[in-house]
Amino acid sequence: MQADCTFCQIVSGELPADLVDEDERTMAFMDISPATLGHVLVVPRRHASDVMSADVEDWLAVAATARRMARWVVGAFRAGGVDLVQANSDGSVGNQTMFHLHVHVLPRYHDDRLGTWWSPETADPSEITEAARRLVDYGRSDPEATEPLASTAT
């Protein structure tokens, strides 16, 4: 637990939250500033500032709980679908303000005001191939990488 972390304080019971679900690794509770009706946050019980520093098993548990919450919010609120949002930044990009790994489960409705995250435009194929090559090259030094790495980007 990190003393100055709001989500750690919720996990420990120091701060109240409208708890929806919990298991040995995760908690799911209602967002106090919801983007849409039924907006749920899923957090690991153990503090990790972001997905890159989280224990793999904690991340998998968060993903499983987020998947379950997605089913629940679609069923309970008759949402048309969900967005799962997980931000990792130092706060200077992406508007992240809570530095405890969490996933937003955002029910989507035809009349919500969330819009789209980006305007998809087809990129130059050579730029896509170069980006893939850079990722594979970087991935070769990652101790968590699994073989075989993609061969199309070599």
Model-derived segments and spans:
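HIT superfamily nucleotide-processing domains
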Residues: M1-T154
